[in-house]
């Protein structure tokens, strides 16, 4: 089975052709980072307009690289939720038009489910029998990105087999990285810059600038708004740091965020009695997170599965794969499929403060 996946939920226009076994035949991503950088974040109207310009050429390139035509496809998958309404609508309209014209089945995919299953993608011609880097169900997954941060128990690929164990009460981890980077004058997107600077910093030298982020509390919930405010107060009092002081502050900030992500994910795996941990989402590309999660899992005898960088950030391949599994299960959507800004995965974490 060969499925085309289309992803336009935020600021990447992406399309890919993937088999139901997870083999990536093509994967094309057009980033909008340069368009949004002057604004310090994603502008929904700008995103939707650029998706409208890019989606058809990106889909054509994905089909061409895979060596297939629309007639060769077994189905078309598209991100239908969650995301920016206008951006989602562009991808949906493109997918619907192609599905109707080619007479192919259409399936909508929850963007978060795509991230949670991205670990199963095989890139670069890996042997079909090579399962060393693929987990078995169930596993505990940390999904951390610019819009979402949550820990899930994943018992299978279906929506009903995925359960949230804990999530952020306010900002997502990636959002915190971008906001702190903006405070420090590091530009957008901030995550990669902070990660690079943190590698040369001493977190202890700036420990007074950041709080501990609930890392030691038993709850599996996160809160990242406080650390942003703490850094803002630090900068307001002392000015924007430069040189080694900047690297130290980045190291302290990143260390606090990563410690919370790692400790709570490991705690969730042990509480669920599951020995497999998966990382997903754009923040999973952070080298500090990868290193600390690997060390923590090794100490506790947990098997860690981390997708390659191309599978962590938004991409069409994860949407195509999740869609292929839906198609293989006999599921279909109609041309009435509409965009939804919220995930279909049930939430257990309340936004805002207060005890659960």
Swiss-Prot record:
Subcellular localization, as worded in the UniProt entry: Cytoplasm
One biological process term in Gene Ontology: tRNA threonylcarbamoyladenosine modification
A Pfam short name: TsaD
The protein's Enzyme Commission number: 2.3.1.234
GO cellular component: cytoplasm
InterPro entries from the UniProt entry: ATPase_NBD (IPR043129), Gcp-like_dom (IPR000905), KAE1/TsaD (IPR017861), TsaD (IPR022450)
Swiss-Prot/TrEMBL catalytic activity: L-threonylcarbamoyladenylate + adenosine(37) in tRNA = N(6)-L-threonylcarbamoyladenosine(37) in tRNA + AMP + H(+)
Cofactor note: Binds 1 Fe(2+) ion per subunit.
Residues bound to Fe cation: 111, 115, 314
Principal location class: cytoplasm
Known cofactor(s): Fe(2+)
Keywords, in A-Z order: Acyltransferase, Cytoplasm, Iron, Metal-binding, Transferase, tRNA processing
Top-level EC class as recorded in UniProt: transferase
GO MF annotation terms: iron ion binding; N(6)-L-threonylcarbamoyladenine synthase activity
NCBIfam families referenced in this protein's UniProt entry, alphabetically: gcp_kae1 (TIGR00329), T6A_TsaD_YgjD (TIGR03723)
Family that this chain belongs to: Belongs to the KAE1 / TsaD family.
Function, in words: Required for the formation of a threonylcarbamoyl group on adenosine at position 37 (t(6)A37) in tRNAs that read codons beginning with adenine. Is involved in the transfer of the threonylcarbamoyl moiety of threonylcarbamoyl-AMP (TC-AMP) to the N6 group of A37, together with TsaE and TsaB. TsaD likely plays a direct catalytic role in this reaction.
HAMAP family given in the database record: TsaD (MF_01445)
The protein's name: tRNA N6-adenosine threonylcarbamoyltransferase
Organism expressing this protein natively: Sorangium cellulosum (strain So ce56) (Polyangium cellulosum (strain So ce56))
Gene giving rise to this polypeptide: tsaD
């Amino acid at each position: 089975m060969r499925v085309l996946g289309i992803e336009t939920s935020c600021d990447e226009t992406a399309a890919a052709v993937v088999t139901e076994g997870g083999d990536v035949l093509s994967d094309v991503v057009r980033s909008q980072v340069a368009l949004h950088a002057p604004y310090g974040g994603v502008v929904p109207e700008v995103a939707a307009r650029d998706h409208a310009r890019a989606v058809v050429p990106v889909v054509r390139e994905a089909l061409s690289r895979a060596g297939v035509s629309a007639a060769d496809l077994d189905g078309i998958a598209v991100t239908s939720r969650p995301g920016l309404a206008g951006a989602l609508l562009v991808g949906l309209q493109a997918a619907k038009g192609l599905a109707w014209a080619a007479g192919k089945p259409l399936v909508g995919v929850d963007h978060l489910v795509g991230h949670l299953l991205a670990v199963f993608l095989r890139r670069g011609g890996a042997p079909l029998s090579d399962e060393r880097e693929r987990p078995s169900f169930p596993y505990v997954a940390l999904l951390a990105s610019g819009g979402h941060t949550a820990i899930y128990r994943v018992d299978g690929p279906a929506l009903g087999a995925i359960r949230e164990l804990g999530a952020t009460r306010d900002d997502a981890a990636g959002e915190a990285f971008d906001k702190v980077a903006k405070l420090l004058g590091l530009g957008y997107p901030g995550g990669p810059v902070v990660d690079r600077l943190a590698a040369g910093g001493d977190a202890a030298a700036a420990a007074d600038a950041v709080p501990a982020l609930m890392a030691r509390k038993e709850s599996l919930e996160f809160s990242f708004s406080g650390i942003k405010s703490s850094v803002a107060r630090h900068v307001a009092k002392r000015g924007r740091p430069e040189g080694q002081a900047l690297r130290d502050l980045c190291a302290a900030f990143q260390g606090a965020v990563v410690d919370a992500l790692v400790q709570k994910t490991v705690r969730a795996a042990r509480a669920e009695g599951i020995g497999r941990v998966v990382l997903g989402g754009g923040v999973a590309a952070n080298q500090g997170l990868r290193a600390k999660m690997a060390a923590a899992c090794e100490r506790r005898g947990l098997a860690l599965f981390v997708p390659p960088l191309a599978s962590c950030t938004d991409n069409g391949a994860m949407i195509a794969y999740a869609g292929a599994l839906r198609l293989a299960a006999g599921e279909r959507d109609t041309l009435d499929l509409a965009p939804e800004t919220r995930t279909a995965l049930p939430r257990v974490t309340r936004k805002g403060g207060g005890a659960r």
